[in-house]
């Protein structure tokens, strides 16, 4: 275990609640808290048994007044989250008592932890690898049960297991090649170019299998940005309200009622989807509405999917044509809204405009919403969403897998010349190094620091 100073942070959200937790980690954590804590039985906590709790009070050192009634828990190294001695103070929830106790802890000789520093110590002390560390923040940020399940799978080492098997196969191959090249006089089983090629091809197959999950995995982790667009008063806000099953957007007969972007999340069979209702796109002299239109265009450019809403009870006009032209290069679904009314849109017109993925709906009556949801899933997922197998959800992991695959392919090219078997080992080692970046075994320190800096305080 590495030699670190003692750190502390408030691990729960500041606000009113049942309890707040202040976490202290480091070899001085128990001694520091002992200065502030007075147990109900009058004993200090230096002889406290690990994995137990003690009841008492935190005492303000300057005034000797009781600050709060608390429970102290103690986890002894290396069997703690950070693999260091760790003490947690459980006090009453609330901003004032939590801050006052935290101030006393810092005054007693503890450094304020940086964002993600507890998890970083768990990684540096060897309790978890980098994929497991990243999974911690993914669990915290998960928006659906499916995204949480995927993050939990990563947190218990499922991704690491697959990566480590691949790395082990690569390093064994390197060892065989180098032994054959460096010690030809020894009585060693010689590895041939074709044998190495067969091993590398199998590894490439495994890399491709993992990479095939990455697009769906990214969506499970980060969700989809879905933008609703259309001219004013075609039913965009009604669609948003119908998808949310609540009245989130104002619905009136007055064009331009939605003047800004409205964003809400929905859970689509475990997929977190951010639905973005935009201001109607049209030419306007109203300054506020004009700003809303510009924001709408920005959201369209950033979107994973655009839902184009057309009013089927009215003929298409220049405003519709302008929007259709603007989104033609995006992935989109066309909704013919107000299907409960007589349709005045000619299907042949839609064919001429090369519009596709057309669904008839009535946002007001609720018709066609399930068809829309199924269409979204079909556009981004190949069949049913698999939750039991390993899914690559992290872009950093995907990029490392791509580099590993490229190195393996370069090794195969080198092996086409049977005399260049030793040259292939260089590329195989590069693949091994790339996979090590995923688990953190071969990653640069500054990149590791950047990853943990994105964590929240207290974690």
From Swiss-Prot:
UniProt xrefs under PANTHER family: TRNA MODIFICATION GTPASE GTPBP3 (PTHR42714), TRNA MODIFICATION GTPASE GTPBP3, MITOCHONDRIAL (PTHR42714:SF2)
GO biological process: one example: tRNA methylation
Gene: mnmE
GO cellular component terms attached to this protein's record: cytosol
Compartments reported by the entry: Cytoplasm
GO terms, molecular function: GTP binding; GTPase activity; metal ion binding
Keywords recorded for this protein, A-Z: Cytoplasm, GTP-binding, Hydrolase, Magnesium, Metal-binding, Nucleotide-binding, Potassium, tRNA processing
Cofactor note: Binds 1 potassium ion per subunit.
Record bears the keyword Ubl conjugation: no
Residues that hold K(+) according to the record: 233, 252, 254, 257
Location (main, coarse): cytoplasm
Function, as annotated: Exhibits a very high intrinsic GTPase hydrolysis rate. Involved in the addition of a carboxymethylaminomethyl (cmnm) group at the wobble position (U34) of certain tRNAs, forming tRNA-cmnm(5)s(2)U34.
Chain positions recorded as (6S)-5-formyl-5,6,7,8-tetrahydrofolate binding sites: 23, 88, 127, 459
Annotated TrmE-type G domain residues: 223-381
Species per Swiss-Prot/TrEMBL record: Clostridium tetani (strain Massachusetts / E88)
Protein name according to UniProt: tRNA modification GTPase MnmE
Family matches, as InterPro entries: G_TrmE, GTP-bd, GTP-bd_TrmE_N, GTPase_MnmE, MnmE_dom2, MnmE_helical, P-loop_NTPase, Small_GTP-bd
Annotated SUPFAM superfamilies: P-loop containing nucleoside triphosphate hydrolases, TrmE connector domain
Enzyme class: hydrolase
Family annotation (Pfam families): MMR_HSR1, MnmE_helical, TrmE_N
Binding site for GTP: 233-238, 252-258, 277-280
Cofactor(s) annotated in UniProt: K(+)
């Amino acid at each position: 275990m590495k030699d670190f100073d003692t750190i502390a942070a408030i691990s729960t959200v500041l606000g009113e609640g049942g309890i707040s937790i202040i976490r202290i980690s480091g070899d001085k954590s128990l001694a520091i808290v002992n200065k502030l804590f007075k147990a109900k039985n009058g004993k200090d906590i230096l002889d406290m048994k690990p994995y137990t709790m003690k009841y008492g009070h935190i005492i303000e050192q300057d005034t000797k007044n009781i600050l709060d009634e608390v429970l102290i828990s103690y986890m002894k190294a290396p069997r703690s989250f950070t693999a260091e001695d760790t003490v947690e103070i459980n006090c009453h929830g609330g901003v004032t008592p939590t801050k006052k106790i935290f101030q006393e802890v810092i005054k007693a000789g503890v450094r304020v932890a940086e964002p993600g520093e507890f998890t970083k110590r768990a990684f540096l002390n060897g309790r978890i690898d980098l994929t497991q560390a990243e999974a911690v923040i993914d669990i915290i940020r998960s928006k659906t049960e499916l995204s949480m399940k995927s993050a939990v799978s990563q947190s218990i080492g499922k991704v690491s297991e697959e990566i480590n098997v691949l790395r082990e196969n690569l390093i064994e191959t390197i060892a065989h090649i180098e032994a054959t090249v460096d010690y030809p006089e020894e009585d060693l089983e010689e590895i041939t170019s074709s044998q190495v090629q067969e091993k590398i091809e199998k590894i490439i197959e495994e890399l491709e299998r993992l990479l095939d999950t990455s697009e769906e995995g990214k969506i499970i982790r980060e969700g989809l940005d879905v933008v609703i667009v259309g001219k004013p008063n075609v039913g965009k806000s009604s669609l948003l309200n119908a998808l949310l099953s609540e009245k989130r957007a104002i619905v009136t007969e007055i064009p331009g009622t939605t003047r800004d972007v409205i964003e809400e999340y929905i859970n689509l069979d475990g997929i977190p989807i951010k639905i973005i209702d935009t201001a109607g796109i049209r030419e306007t002299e109203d300054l506020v509405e004009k700003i809303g239109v510009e924001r709408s265009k920005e959201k369209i450019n950033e979107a994973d999917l655009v839902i184009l809403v057309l009013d089927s009870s009215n003929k298409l006009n220049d405003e519709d044509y302008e929007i259709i032209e603007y989104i033609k290069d995006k992935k989109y679904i066309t909704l013919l809204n107000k299907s409960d009314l007589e349709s005045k849109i000619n299907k042949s017109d839609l064919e001429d405009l090369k519009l596709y993925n057309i669904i008839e709906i009535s946002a007001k009556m609720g018709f066609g919403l399930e068809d829309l949801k199924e269409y979204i899933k079909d556009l981004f997922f190949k069949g049913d969403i698999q939750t039991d197998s390993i899914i690559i959800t992290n872009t950093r992991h995907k990029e490392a897998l791509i580099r590993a695959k490229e190195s393996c392919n370069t090794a195969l090219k080198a092996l086409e010349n049977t005399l260049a078997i030793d040259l292939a080992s260089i590329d195989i080692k590069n693949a091994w190094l790339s996979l090590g970046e995923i688990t953190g075994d071969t990653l640069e320190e500054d990149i590791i620091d950047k990853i943990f800096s994105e964590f929240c305080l207290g974690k």
